[in-house]
């Protein structure tokens, strides 16, 4: 092979990623095979998990689908898992895939309404601390009845809308015309400082909102997928689930909201940045012009979107169908009654969610490796061998640690299955079984905010269109989530250990 051709292949491999990153991925692929053959599948499995976390941490260097996908293909070739195991994992999580395919697209068609509502909130509330608290509380409240990914998609859609409006105006473009807003080259130097401050402002709101989904999601049967799973195993209905989990979930919710206020007041961990006056003026002018120029057709479209939002909330609250199917219904209703009949306009709605959907398939493949190699089995056995009074607290910690690096639905599935088996074998009372079930539920929900790996909503935020725009990297997410992780983790552990 000629030198120029070799250079071309090297340049094409993972595109514009840094050379050191490309070398790391090639090194991972070689190392995995060596470790598997020399040490064994368990060591190779843990190595794969660490490598996948690395690709997520470097999401701004290269979208994790490509390097993660290469690691997945190698794991399948090395028989660390099988295509059938991956397929079964996807079948088990098909509702999540449906949700990403259709619900996120449905939210896209509601972006005019969302931008209208959030701009009123953003421009109407001057206090940043109060605004952050409202974002966090609303996210928590909505996530208690809706899906955390849906709520996150709403927040992301609003943030992209705000960012695009200011960036286009600052670049001298029409904010109502589609134009590139990810490149700062055409931005006058005068606006760079305001833009950086605006990015920090949006980052803090996005993180408050994302944490809010975890605070609210833990409270109810429909808040998170693993809640439904645990509730089904325990035979708990909506009200019973809420009351059983309340001694842990409600104090943590209050503590989370207090943490939100303190972070904004103290300006720690990257929080507390105010909305620049110039940006506020641009957004206010845009909102005023929008209101003045709104035609009867646009008002009718907003009304349709509002009705669709009510139908969406009712459909999700009463669980009339899988979340993704409700999202498809929203797409049909809004497009039919607002005159969106062009295939290309429909296609735009699916652009943001499909890369993440593909990445989630790779994520489930890593989960399949964890399951096939029984990487968590020793930890589960150790916890269940402890004295009964220590089990809830240790189960909470074990769940939290594993949920921070793996899928919390998977972790909850493994633990509740093992604990139920122990209960059916007569090793514990029904009361103790219920206590352990609450520990599993809260342990998989609360400490998992530590990294984007644990919460699907966090992973969605990290790999969404808004993350590179506001410079929200993996490391920055972990740093900004740290105070919440400490407060929610410690109080959750204390409540599980002493208040149940």
Swiss-Prot record:
Residue ranges crossing the lipid bilayer per the database entry: 28-50, 58-78, 96-116, 129-149, 150-170, 205-225, 241-261, 311-331, 350-370, 394-414, 449-469, 477-497
InterPro entries named in the record: Na+/H+_antiporter_NhaB
GO molecular function: sodium:proton antiporter activity
Subcellular compartments: Cell inner membrane
GO CC terms: plasma membrane
Record key words, sorted: Antiport, Cell inner membrane, Cell membrane, Ion transport, Membrane, Sodium, Sodium transport, Transmembrane, Transmembrane helix, Transport
Upper taxonomic lineage: Bacteria, Pseudomonadati, Pseudomonadota, Gammaproteobacteria, Pseudomonadales
Pfam families with a match to the protein in the record: NhaB (PF06450)
Protein's UniProt name: Na(+)/H(+) antiporter NhaB
Catalysed conversion reaction: 2 Na(+)(in) + 3 H(+)(out) = 2 Na(+)(out) + 3 H(+)(in)
Gene behind this protein: nhaB
Broad class of the protein's primary localization: membrane
Species this protein is from: Pseudomonas fluorescens (strain Pf0-1)
UniProt record similarity statement: Belongs to the NhaB Na(+)/H(+) (TC 2.A.34) antiporter family.
Domain of life: Bacteria
Function: Na(+)/H(+) antiporter that extrudes sodium in exchange for external protons.
Membrane topology of the entry: Multi-pass membrane protein
């Amino acid at each position: 092979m000629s030198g120029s051709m070799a250079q071309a292949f090297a340049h094409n491999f993972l595109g514009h990623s840094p050379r050191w990153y490309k070398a790391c991925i090639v090194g991972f692929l070689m190392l995995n095979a060596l470790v598997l053959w020399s040490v064994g599948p368990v060591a190779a499995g843990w190595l794969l998990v660490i490598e996948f976390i690395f690709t997520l941490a470097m999401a701004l260097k290269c979208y994790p689908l490509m390097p993660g996908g290469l690691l997945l293909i190698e794991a399948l070739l090395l028989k660390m898992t099988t295509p059938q195991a991956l397929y079964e994992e996807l079948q088990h999580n098909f509702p999540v895939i449906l949700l990403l395919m259709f619900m996120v697209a449905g939210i896209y068609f509601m972006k005019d309404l969302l931008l209208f509502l959030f701009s009123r909130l953003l421009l109407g509330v001057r206090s940043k601390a109060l605004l952050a608290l409202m974002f966090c509380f609303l996210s928590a409240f909505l996530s208690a009845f809706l899906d955390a990914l849906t709520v996150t998609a709403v927040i992301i859609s609003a943030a992209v809308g705000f960012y695009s409006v200011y960036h286009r105006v600052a670049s001298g473009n029409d904010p109502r015309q589609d134009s590139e807003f990810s490149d700062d080259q055409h931005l006058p130097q005068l606006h760079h400082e305001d833009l950086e401050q605006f990015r920090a402002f949006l980052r803090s709101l996005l993180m408050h909102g994302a944490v809010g989904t975890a605070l609210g999601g833990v409270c109810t049967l429909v808040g998170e997928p693993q809640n439904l799973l645990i509730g089904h195993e325990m035979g708990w209905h909506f009200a019973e689930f809420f009351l059983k989990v309340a001694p842990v979930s409600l104090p943590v919710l209050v503590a989370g909201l207090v943490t939100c206020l303190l972070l904004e007041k103290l300006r720690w961990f990257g929080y507390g940045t105010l909305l620049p006056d110039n940006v506020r003026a641009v957004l206010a002018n845009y909102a005023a012009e929008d209101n003045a120029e709104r035609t009867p057709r646009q008002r009718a479209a907003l009304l349709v979107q509002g009705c669709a939002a009510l139908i969406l909330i009712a459909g999700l609250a009463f669980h009339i169908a899988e979340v993704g199917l409700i999202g498809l219904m929203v797409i049909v209703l809004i497009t039919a009654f607002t005159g969106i009949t062009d295939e290309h306009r429909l296609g735009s709605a699916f652009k943001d969610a499909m890369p993440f959907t593909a990445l989630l398939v790779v994520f489930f493949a890593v989960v399949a490796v964890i399951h096939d190699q029984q990487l968590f089995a020793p930890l589960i056995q150790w916890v269940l061998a402890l004295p009964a009074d220590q089990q809830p607290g240790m189960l909470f910690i074990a769940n939290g640690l594993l949920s921070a690096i793996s899928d919390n639905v998977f972790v909850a599935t493994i633990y509740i299955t093992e604990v139920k088996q122990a209960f059916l074998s007569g090793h514990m009372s029904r009361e103790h079984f219920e206590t352990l079930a609450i520990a599993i539920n809260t342990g998989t929900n609360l400490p998992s905010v530590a990294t984007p790996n644990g919460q699907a909503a966090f992973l969605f935020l990290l790999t969404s269109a808004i993350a590179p725009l506001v410079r929200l990297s993996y490391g920055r997410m972990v740093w900004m989530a740290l105070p919440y992780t400490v407060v929610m983790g410690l109080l959750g552990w204390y409540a599980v250990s002493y208040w149940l």
